Amino acid sequence: MTNKKYHTTLLFYLAAFFLPVLIMIGVLYSQKIYPGSERTILTSDGFHQYVIFATGLRNILHGDGSLFYTFTSGLGLNFYALTSYYLGSFLSPLYYFFTVNQMADAFYYITLLKFGLIGLSGAFSFKRLFTKVSRSFILCLSTGFALMSFATSQLEINTWLDAFILAPLIILGLHLLLRFNRRGLYFFSLTCLFIQNYYFGYMMAIFLTLYTIVQLITIKGWKSKILHFIDFGIVSILAGLSSAVMLLPTLLDLTTHGEKFTGASSLLTESTYYFDFFAKNLVGVYDTTKFGSIPMIYVGILPLILFLLFFISREIKLSLRLGYLLLVAFFIASFYLQPLDLFWQGMHAPNMFLHRYSWLLSLLTVLLAGETLNRIRKFSFKRLLLSFLGLSTAYLLTWIFQSHYSFIEPVSWLLSIAFLLAYAILFTSYFRQQIPGSVFRCFTFLFCIFELALSTYYVVGALGNEWVFPTREGYLRNMSAITKLVSKTKQANKTFYRTERLEAQTGNDSMKFNYNGISQFSSIRNTASSSTLDRLGFKSEGTNLNLRYQNNTIIADSLFGIKYNLSNFDLNKYGFNHVTSEKTMGLYQNNNASQLAILTDGIYNNIDFTVNTLDNQTSLLNTLSGLNSTYFKRAPSQLFDKDAKSLNQRVAKNVSNSNKDFVTITYQVIAPPHSQLYVSIPNISWSDDNNHSLSITVNGVTKNQVTDNTFDFFDLGYFETESMVTIKLSFPGNKAISFDNPSFYALDTQNYQIAMDTINERDSKVTTSKNKVFVDYSSKTNASLFFTIPYDKGWTATINHKKVKIQRAQKGFMKVDVPSGKGKVVLTFIPYGLKTGSLISLLASIIFCCYAYFIRKTTIIQKS
């Protein structure tokens, strides 16, 4: 390679990388997002999940935790499985180099890096796929793919971007396999995709099968077609098996703990209309990434024109055009037919961010645009004109029926028509030889990049308007104070304990602030333990996507080892004492918190839970303590509000016609002596569905309550002596409120104290290290260790170095039966299936190498 050619190639690849990066930098800067800026890129799930899980990984890489298991989420969680869904990127280790306070900037840098790598891999692959296409057009295709609306509209889910880095390489590898019998790139890139993101790997596998069937049309002879398809199948299967080191443990975790398949509720998907394909191929169009969205498929008007031209060009084999047309039709049918839509997504209905496979249609659009450009000199001007007229007509029909597309802004229509006209003029001038090829390529490139930049600007702006890009101050709020308090608790304790925050910012605060906790918001979760916790007052309903600590009792606190509470308000919970404070954040210690492993009096037998939370807590506490006490009783109460109406077991109040800003309802309650008081307010109906604020004033002291994803069960404080308590329920922002008659409950703290003393006096001490749990116990009788750890087949146990069986306890937890006397129990977590998966990966890789060598050897012999 000459110096000039080398430098030209280098500049080409630098441009491929930096074009999407610079556009994204400019677009994000327009949203006031840049390194160190007040606003951050952490919108929607980026704030609540992805950056927090990245922080968890960062802490583990710094030696604080295990890549296999973490106790900082949902009582305990298979972190290896979590990694496969949320952190499956070869770039994730880069988070190691940032501090916890720099994670917002780390997320920004790595997201930009991924956009650049998409452009780079696209340029590398498309240049080899479409050898007759000029580099300027290759850059148009690679930049269009990098900045497709699917990626930019969901940029906060930056783990998905890794799939787009690998996709062009996989397609290039497939072409090398089918055309030149070269299998290495296809095998390696597909294996990497399965390892990094099994979810998108599944979608890609479907696409590759369909795409290969169409590609076989170009291969002559049925025997050759069959042999090539078998070859494709063998290499694809070996790639899947080679990724078993990640796939098998993840699959086993999902089948054991994941949610069930989603059945189709109707034939058609929601919010669809006839011209969705063209409506979503306008410049800068964004409807929503919440429910009711239609697919994000924009990759640029230029690729779309060339994509349409592909199907009307006689220069391309009719059977090939029909094959691709059927593939496109299958995609479009999937957007409309719910069963097909679910099939692409593994028979699981997504929680927002719908049609997650639609990026594959964007990829196909770019590939067919490249095929068209590869033959552009052979096309007739009339066919080209027909492509422009067809797209113009489609846009016109979409505009006529724009009542179905209220999300399309006038600027999108104007820009789309303007760029369509610009491309039409350029192509017409070139085909009529009115401008030289260099001018045509230069101006087409400039218009294309400018169009993509504008579209990205409007899409990201709309994303920010819908979800809001949060401030850095908001993300780091209380970070310093909580970090210091958590550090103090770690210094003060040698045995295992849990901490929870009363005024949560996210469902994953425990992982964000690096303390062992209960709350969780994750697609990777233990549904069995979450369902059991739901029965015990930690709300986790439906598919168990959410699990929340807040709004439960001190019984639940103590049984699940909650030794510390973090709170901005003075805490009035029996057994909790103030330890210290940092700024406005207080640290409170629970003197009754149990160990991670509760030693029972005799062998533990499962009990039946009902739908009544307090009954379940009573039964569990009595079973673990060996007592038969009563803990909860109703506290007498009276509605003390003349403007509130009580009718048919419902309480209602409306202040719309008064000068009051919101509803307040007052009760008087008699709190028994030695009682922790609670109130249950079922089935609240809010006049403002966007404002579910509730504050409760107890004897003049007001506290804001948590109502998001929690039970409507609120703590009213501890009362040492019998008291007449005035309770005022306030609903800010709501001028009309109704709810079922509230129930006030008093927890007998004397009986509770006896039960917890009975449990905690037993000799059981628990420590943890990485993926191991160590229990030193002493028991006078044969007993059980009841572990408040989610049941998982990845756990193994030994007693005094002898392997023993771990049993399910209450469906979601674990127990180990232990003999009398002193002993040491060690639990070790290795993701279930990891050892087998590692062996399968090794064998599959060896088999692939042997297979590739054998085929190559056979081919050489046949040629000779």
Enumerate the predicted regions with their spans.
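Start-transfer (signal-anchor) and selected internal transmembrane alpha helices
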Residues: 1-31, 443-444, 846-864
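Active-site-proximal, structured, solvent-exposed surfaces of multi-pass membrane proteins
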Residues: 2-4, 639-864
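Membrane-interface coil-to-helix junctions
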Residues: 10-13, 20-122, 143-164, 203, ...
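Membrane-embedded helix bundles of polyisoprenyl
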Residues: 21, 111, 115-128, 134-178, ...
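Periplasmic/ER-lumenal interhelical loops and adjacent helix-loop junctions
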Residues: 44, 48-49, 55, 229-231, ...
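Membrane-interface micro-motifs in multi-pass membrane enzymes
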Residues: 80-85, 104-117, 137-138, 144-168, ...
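Contiguous transmembrane helix-bundle modules in multi-pass membrane proteins
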Residues: 200, 326, 348, 354-478, ...
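Extracytoplasmic/lumenal acceptor-recognition loop(s) of multi-pass membrane glycoenzymes
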Residues: 450-468, 488-556, 594, 599-610, ...
